[in-house]
Amino acid sequence: YVRDYIDLYITGSNAFFLSGELATLLTGRYIEQHVLPLSFQEFKQWHIENNPIIQQLSNRDLYAMYTRSSFPYTLAMTSQQETYDYLQAVYASVMFKDVIPRLNTADINSLERVARYLASVTGSPISINKIKNTFVSSGVKISFETVKRYIQGLQDSLLFYSAAQFKVRGRELLQSSEKYYLVDVGLRRIMLPDANADQGHILENVIYLELIRRGYTVYVGRVDEYEIDFVAVDNLQNLTYYQVALETLNEETLSRELRPLQKISDSYPKYLLTLDTIGTEANYNGIVKMNALDWLLWHCCK
């Protein structure tokens, strides 16, 4: 099928797609392009071109709409109920067509519990052992290996992504715990009783996906006892550090968010991203504070 005048595109919806026989046949002959839901910039551009009331909406208004779902198909939907129904269909399709057949599990209830638990702890470092102990203490019989297998299945289906911990001094990976993020924060609406709770971690989820979209490998940083939300590593092994907070107008909150970045001794770029509209573009001894929505719309290079 190889011809000079033919470009062949093969699409798939999970990480299993290029495994096994197909990968053997295509080895060395393909370029894999990872596609995520819409970025905030793409979402805004669509509304500029198609939504006549866009001029009346602030970036914050658009962000509220964006967090309902960033799947392209939802742009054509006229009600939140329609979007909700679509997200339910997407979630069910992923679980019953991708995850459950691949894991070959009959315990769908436990798998669902693990998925919902990961959604509820978005942005919080969590270990497999802690997840297992949480379920066991609530009366659910589940093993470490089962939890591990379920999480791997949820990640292979591209429903969840993870960020491992990275020790900044010494540049080594830590195996203790990871953070997990949903492919679309709108899925929280069908997985959790209060999807709008914890807006700070929802923002963190959005920033994580944008870093992946921009081509970075993303880790959670550790400096002594302090956590850095993201260490973004480019293809040349250059680092950029990010702290993400909903707001830092309170001096105590600002100091707390700056402290981990201040503990870093190297000269790589450091950013504090918030939804603050006052005091943006401040610089704290090399730590640049930016409005997170401006950063999402910022055409920066890797």
Predicted regions mapped to residue ranges:
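Active-site-adjacent loop/helix micro-motif of nuclease/hydrolase catalytic cores
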Residues: 248-259
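Loop/turn-to-beta-strand initiation segments
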Residues: 4-9
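Active-site ExK catalytic segment of metal-dependent nucleases
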Residues: 240-249
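Nucleic-acid nuclease catalytic cores
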Residues: 223, 265-284
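Accessory nucleic acid-recognition modules appended to NTPase machines
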Residues: 79-238
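Switch/connector loops and helix/strand junctions flanking conserved nucleotide-binding motifs
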Residues: 16-21, 41-44, 251-252, 279-283, ...
